Amino acid sequence: MHKLVSQLVVYRNLPADNLLEPLAAICARFAGGSYNREELTAEIYEQVHKLLDIGTVYGFDKNLWHNYLAFLLVSCENPFAITCEKVGACDGSVNQFAKHDFKIFQQLFAYDFSELERALEINCFSLISNYQAVVKQERRYNKNISDKVQALSTALEGAADADEFFACVTKFYHDYGVGKLGLNKAFRIAQAQQGEPELVPISNTEQITFDDLIGYEDQKQRLLENTEAFVAGRPANNVLLFGDSGTGKSSSIKALINKYYDQGLRMIEIYKHQFRDLSQVIAQIKNRNYRFIIYMDDLSFEEFEIEYKYLKAIIEGGLEVRPDNILIYATSNRRHLINETWKDRNDVTQEDGIYKSDTMQEKLSLVNRFGCTIYYGQPTQKEYYKIVCELAKKQGLELADDFLCAEARKWELHHGGISGRTAQQFINYLQGVADFSKK
């Protein structure tokens, strides 16, 4: 194995925490005969333990060795893979180097660990080649990655030669992408050791859809139309969803990533204390073959906060043009995002309804940079009852509408008033009581 791994060209720079190189070194020591049996066995178990951990995180099953090799291929962000991500497999000399590496990976897929197992009297490699994972709930592992990697692993197992192997891998790159941006829907920003911001995958995103959001049909339609245009490569606007709390603004944004992930949409969640990192984040993603929504939840600024100036410059106003593959979507309970004070109005005059205050104009200019503003208002009492009844049906609660409405009325009087969130909390309560009564 060590000889095979040492001959990789395109895939030579494997991730630092890869298992392939340590296993190759173990095989080299075994082949050379200069090893301590107990130490070598312990090292093998250490790598197998890591493989089992990876299998648990991603929900891998059956042949964990093949799954891991497939996972390694889709995780390596080398120039060849990133080019395939954008345009698919193109003619060029690099293809010959890639096929050379894929021939090696084919041999790794078929690698025979039996001699090693016999000599050390172990059977761990046999076990991981036919692994039966414990059934887990989807929220306990990244099902999105699991399904895609295992499908690729199965396809690569059936590849007759390096050309078929090449076709399978490059198709995956073009269809889904490569690395963490290709495999994950959503990200948050963390500060790396070097001080530069790092995109960290959010592995378990909420599986909400627009069908789960009752009402607000006009608002959802406007949001979908703008996002459809963006994903399709047509002109689209930055979006601000504003209005009363608990009305579904954040849920609408979350539903977008579930609807359009397969079409190349990715989402990056950012908080206002991270706005100064936006330029560096954009530099990391602007040349990738995805559409990015930079998402800001519950956005608002107090009088003393100046982070909004970073945001203004990024959205529109800086020297560098915002890339076509990036939009900013925000939610807020405030229409104008920034808290206004009477001091802001001291020098206000009004001509035909236009404020002349420089302070106010500076603050209001931020919201004007969102070309699409959508209002989510508090539902009426009738709409609230409709939301309650629809949610009850979706959850399988067989209760009369009159009873639901009467109880929902009592609930909202003590739980923050009428809203979609209040309705969902009420249904959660009813479902919990129903489940408890069955015990």
Positions of PLM-derived features:
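Interdomain "pre-motor" coupling segment immediately N-terminal to P-loop NTPase/helicase cores
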Residues: 135-199
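Conserved AAA+ ATPase "SRH/arginine-finger" region at the nucleotide-binding site
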Residues: 349-364, 371-385
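C-terminal alpha-helical "lid" subdomain
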Residues: 373, 377-439
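N-terminal pre-Walker A segment at the start of P-loop NTPase domains
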Residues: 202-228
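Intrinsically disordered, low-complexity N-terminal extensions of AAA+/P-loop NTPases
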Residues: 1-157
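Walker A/P-loop nucleotide-binding motif
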Residues: 234-253
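AAA+/P-loop NTPase substrate/partner-engagement loops
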Residues: 259-292, 299-304
